[in-house]
């Protein structure tokens, strides 16, 4: 209900972390074959994913999925894919931004330079930034990417507040300015798990778990609650002696995830589960 901009995204966490993820390398296991997508290529390998009651999202691989094979003790797994969901259009936008190297960290002098001038220089053509991007990327002025760039402020004559900066600094500045929640708006976190098991005789059964959680305006964001409450519960369990294994642990053992998931129900963080033969 707060999806009110052409980017289909608002920030309830660090802009720099979101931007850093745009260059992240991803690795997945598909049909027993490892596939590596370096330097943001994962955004070029996207598929559509339907979430009941919410609609269709884009899904793309996030970081190294193959680690879960050992972590969860499932050496027989043929496919392991950890992905991120976004509203349609996000991956196209990130791909174009990667092509014009707007996520790079090379610093250059920008004293007295406008955002529009910076955009033209980054696109490699002097003059109008819209025309520069269209020439560089082979797009029409009315394309969705160009319209998103206009809305975010890339074509404005506003002077950059830096004597020197990188392309990443500019996009972070605009993200922080425009991709924000209003005081009465709430964020949403969606988590979907799918596990398909094959049984003797060839029968295959699919297990699905879905979490849809919303923040509360003026109190907390969903991203803060769903990432902060689980480790807080784990800390309490350590103090109570319910978790006794020493060291820095990922929540991949039953000693950790079973009691934490059970306690999360009391906080209203619940995954709805379904299963069916496929």
Language-model segments: which ranges?
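C-terminal catalytic/substrate-binding lobe primarily of soluble NAD(P)-dependent oxidoreductases
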Residues: 1-278
């Amino acid at each position: 209900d707060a999806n009110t901009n052409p980017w289909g995204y608002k920030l309830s966490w660090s802009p720099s972390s979101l931007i850093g993820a745009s260059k992240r390398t991803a690795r997945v296991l598909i049909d027993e074959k490892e596939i590596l997508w370096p330097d943001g290529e994962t955004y070029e390998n996207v598929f559509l994913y339907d979430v009941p009651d919410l609609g269709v999202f884009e899904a793309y691989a996030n970081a190294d999925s193959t680690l879960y094979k050992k972590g969860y003790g499932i050496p027989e797994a043929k496919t392991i894919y950890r992905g991120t969901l976004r509203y349609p259009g996000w991956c196209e936008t990130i791909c174009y931004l990667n092509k014009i190297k707007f996520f790079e960290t090379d610093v250059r002098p920008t004293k007295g330079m406008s955002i529009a001038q910076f955009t033209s220089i980054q696109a490699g053509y002097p003059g109008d930034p819209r025309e520069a991007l269209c020439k560089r990327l082979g797009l029409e002025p009315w394309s969705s990417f160009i319209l998103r760039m206009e809305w975010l402020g890339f074509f404005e004559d506003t002077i950059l507040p830096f004597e020197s900066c990188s392309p990443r600094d500019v996009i972070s500045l605009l993200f922080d300015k425009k991709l924000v929640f209003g005081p009465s708006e709430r964020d949403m976190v969606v988590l979907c798990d799918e596990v398909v098991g094959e049984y003797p005789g060839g029968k295959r059964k699919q297990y699905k778990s879905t979490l849809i959680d919303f923040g509360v305006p003026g109190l907390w964001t969903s991203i803060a609650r769903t990432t902060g409450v689980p480790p807080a519960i784990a800390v309490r369990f350590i103090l109570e002696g319910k978790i006794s294994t020493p060291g820095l642990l990922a929540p991949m053992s039953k000693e950790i995830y079973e009691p934490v998931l059970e306690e999360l129900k009391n906080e209203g963080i619940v995954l709805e589960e379904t299963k069916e033969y496929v």
